[in-house]
Amino acid sequence: MTLKNRYKESIRPKLLKDLGLKNIHQVPKVVKVNVNRGLGEAASNSKSLEASLNEMATITGQKALVTRAKKAIAGFKIREGMPIGCTVTLRGDRMYSFLERFINLALPRIRDFRGVNPKSFDGRGNYTVGVKEQLIFPEISFDKIDSIRGMDITIVTSARSDQEGKALLQELGMPFSKN
């Protein structure tokens, strides 16, 4: 059973009861997933940007968008409009597919993994987790990468509070640490 079907058939009714909501449309749901990677070396090395775009497309199944500098910062040696990273916004079926692979395949492959930090909510029910290396995703092989790069994964929910967001992600299978 896919994560989307599991959400509709078992998770949503359970959350409706657990959170004491009256309407099924009040139940929090995952709106979108943002996968973001900042590349400091992209200003001087265009190959790293290309490799990063390909990796993001392989991991998410969707073409990555190049993010550009909004203004020049001399200390970082960047000018306005220079490529400084890439991002992918996932919605719908691709989002659920990515979440399922991230929770069930990628997270358990992290070395010394004891769960994700339960304090990484933003106050409005959205959750962000940083990944230190792209090798945790089974789609990326060690032989094909030029360097190890991390990324930020933000799960945007329709939850009104951190407690609702955490309840939703726990039901989806997110392994929170106990501390």
Swiss-Prot record:
Q: Which residues form a coiled coil?
A: none
The molecular function GO annotations come to:
rRNA binding; structural constituent of ribosome; tRNA binding
Pfam families linked to this entry: Ribosomal_L5 (PF00281), Ribosomal_L5_C (PF00673)
| Entry superkingdom | Bacteria
- Give UniProt keywords alphabetically: Ribonucleoprotein, Ribosomal protein, RNA-binding, rRNA-binding, tRNA-binding
User: A single GO CC term, please?
Assistant: ribosome
Does the record carry Ribonucleoprotein as a key word?
Answer: yes
GO biological process terms, alphabetically, are: translation
- The answer to whether keyword Calcium applies is no
Q: PROSITE patterns given for it? A: RIBOSOMAL_L5
Query: Family assignment?
Result: Belongs to the universal ribosomal protein uL5 family.
Described by its record, this protein's role is as follows: This is one of the proteins that bind and probably mediate the attachment of the 5S RNA into the large ribosomal subunit, where it forms part of the central protuberance. In the 70S ribosome it contacts protein S13 of the 30S subunit (bridge B1b), connecting the 2 subunits; this bridge is implicated in subunit movement. Contacts the P site tRNA; the 5S rRNA and some of its associated proteins might help stabilize positioning of ribosome-bound tRNAs.
PANTHER family linked: 60S RIBOSOMAL PROTEIN L11-RELATED (PTHR11994)
Subunit relationships: Part of the 50S ribosomal subunit; part of the 5S rRNA/L5/L18/L25 subcomplex. Contacts the 5S rRNA and the P site tRNA. Forms a bridge to the 30S subunit in the 70S ribosome.
- NCBIfam families named among the record's database cross-references: PRK00010.1
List the HAMAP family.
Ribosomal_uL5_B
Q: Report the protein name in the record.
A: Large ribosomal subunit protein uL5
What organism is the protein native to?
Prochlorococcus marinus (strain MIT 9312)
Q: Which gene encodes it?
A: rplE
